[in-house]
């Protein structure tokens, strides 16, 4: 059965074995995640150290939250390690430094677009710079250096190649296809890389949102604790106010305490300090007002803090709406990637098939024509399609990375809002704990003092009852001591008789091992233990009886005082529960009696005079009854021990079992029960038979009870033994399991040690890589600073030009406004002069008529003189009017020309009303003509043919008509029409409004162009960092490194190799993978030369295993070569790689030592070293 049990429990143990606890660690700002096993870490500190090494966050700056906002504590982590029942295995990691940008959350910084600034404050520039610094120095983004990792796809060399039939031959076709295959492989790698980045960045963005949500939940939990603390304070204050005695204690003091008398006859008011209570009442009123004011203020602050949390939640939701990428948008990219794979496969297959052809097949014109068709098709269709797809994916990745960076900035800003909200709620918590709690404790202290006034009647009544109980207890103790002395004396006498009887029966034999059988040392010790060294005499008994009598008198006195007190308290306003409690306590106290065992009940019925009355034994309390049962149990245990001692069979070996047994032959049939009553056999003859029978009957009854108890105990003992055996078996099984677990624990420890060592090694490697990256970043930063300084100079120059243009525009505007004012003033003056002249003409005509009618003779006499004067005056007015008209027309022409020069045309609408509208290309004709004055760029006063305005043409026609018409009514009519049209133009403010609006548009356009220029400058910097250089290499340039191609015509011939190295397009071979180990170019060219000579001497069978040098791809430079100096085995296992040039060493092939690659004499070549940025494995 044991084996069956083992087999049945084995599957159960296998089922309950917990799985390993895995955890996902998420960087809440960068979106990165790590999956690890929590069992690798023995404590939370080790767990934090692992995260700190991974993300370069100091352990003291780490904040780890669980998915529902709980902070990870050592106790939680320990529970996860021990129980493995923790279901929340996602850990969100925050850098506390990112919470340092503390800002108040307001509704003004709600986001509306992806490009909006997360900081909308007067110091937004400083805050933005701080934000950039925090993000830069916290290692929060996996793609922080993505600008250097992302390589922009470059066009195929096939696009610029000449694929005419006349230029096609074996070498040109194979070189072109080989180079294009290299470009195709590089493009395919880039596309696969871009495609894999899209879901990763989308997942990072989603995790950033989850991190913000978890942090907001953490804030809500923190604030919930503070709100609970506030609610508890308010509830406590309400309880104090509702149950307080501030306004009730005086009534109790005057109405109740004055009617109750104490033992001395005074009222209970003497126990109350009335002055202190009055002072406390004033303090309570002031304190209540202060606490209410503080709590109301805290309530407003809590509500404001809740509004902050709502704003943060709204901001997070708005961010989720704005920055969540639309995954349906990337379905097109998936289709493009599929078509890309098909095109790449087809194009590579066609190129491989051509490269597999022999050189003789290229002599056929039909084959060359087919090559021409294939290359033309690839050049016009396939290459462009592939390049377009790669460009689309590249731009998509760039947008996603920019989107993530912008989201990170907004996320850090929201963390600052969360930090502000938490600091505010922390201040509220401190206020509640420090000030409000102290005030409430003081309030409670005062209320307790007030409540003592109302509780005083109850407490004083309980005091009187307790005093009565103590007197009763002491009286009963005195009675008990008196009875106990009598019982003790009786015990001693009975024991002496028993000992004498035993000595008489067994003393002669017992002297063998006991000489002094009549020793009374135990009686001496008993006397020393007891306070009385001798039996009490009659005088002491009389004193005890007197003391008892005195205590009885005191009891009667206190009992009367209690009855009077109960009568008084019933007449007051004390509540009924208090009166009932006092009555019940008094009733129980009067029935209080001490329970003790009276020996005389079993030995001497005649000495039962001082026993407890039957009425007293009935009124025992429940606690006293329990104590009585315990006493009976102890008595039964002592009787059981006496019974076992009396039974000879229970004695140990050697006692009454030797040859000295005196009753061996004569007492074989002695019953145990009878032997238990040996005292009966040993009783002196003077003991009455009645007492013996009573004791024997009592003992027999007790023996029967004890025998049944012994049987029960033996049965229980047997059950306990079985249970003990079963427990022992379980303990042994558990011990085996523990030993197995210890072995497993040791194995786990060894595994963990090995893993920690491996982790340390990987950490060191990562640190070395980071050091290299830091070096590269330093060089990149230097180049970037140079570019930025150049761009800043250009920006300053453009800004200065823009400032000059703005000043010129303002100056022209001021001049224009002044000229307009002058023109208006002149027009008004001319109008006034015209009216004045008209009135003078009318007046003169009237005077002339009167003069002619009154004196014809006098008129005839002086007819020549007035006519001459009128004619001169009219000619003068006419000339002045003509000058004024010319001046007005010149002003209007100039204004209209200014409008057209800034692109505005003065024309008519459909209702024949004058309007000014924007017309593109209007000022081109003006700019191309030579009529403008070179100094002012204004219209010549004598030529207005460039003005295209129909309104101006109409005014011009009217002006010409006025000039052509002679003086008279018709001319006056034309002048009125001319002035009316001019008035219509200037009265409606069309000219001023149009010019001001146009300059505002120009200013807006200038700002827009400045912003676009900044964006283009950023793109230019980005493209500058990402471009792959194809000629004139410098330190820091990106270059494509490929293995050189050897096309050996015959064994041992290096001619084709030399020609291969000398060719620009055939200097690399992408059709076949490189050998296992790339050629290691040493620092000295002579060593390179010796390697080449040694390679030439190798047999043809081993020539395919030669190590070929690598060179930088130079498609547009035929005179210079760039060979890789490979000291660290960079090319091992690579088909090609893109590297950044670190060093350049110049050589001229003028001697064999400087020409290890057999280049044409006088050729210039460089020896370069590089670091790998991207590569394609074999």
UniProtKB/Swiss-Prot annotation:
Any matching Pfam family: ATG11
Subcellular compartments: Preautophagosomal structure membrane; Vacuole membrane
Keywords from the UniProt entry: Acetylation, Autophagy, Coiled coil, Membrane, Protein transport, Transport, Vacuole
Coiled-coil portions: 538-572, 696-846
Gene Ontology CC annotations of this record: Atg1/ULK1 kinase complex; phagophore assembly site membrane; vacuolar membrane
GO molecular function, one term: molecular adaptor activity
Matching InterPro entries: ATG11 (IPR040040), Atg11_C (IPR019460), ATG17-like_dom (IPR045326)
Described purpose of this protein according to its UniProt entry: Involved in cytoplasm to vacuole transport (Cvt), pexophagy, mitophagy and nucleophagy. Recruits mitochondria for their selective degradation via autophagy (mitophagy) during starvation, through its interaction with ATG32. Works as scaffold proteins that recruit ATG proteins to the pre-autophagosome (PAS), the site of vesicle/autophagosome formation. Required for ATG9 anterograde transport from the mitochondria to the PAS. Also recruits the ATG19-prAPE1 complex to the PAS. Required for the Cvt vesicles completion. Plays a significant role in life span extension.
Quaternary structure note: Homodimer and potential homooligomers. Interacts with ATG1 kinase and the ATG19 and ATG34 cargo protein transporters. Interacts with ATG9, ATG17, ATG20, ATG30, ATG32, ATG36 and YPT1.
Name this polypeptide is given: Autophagy-related protein 11
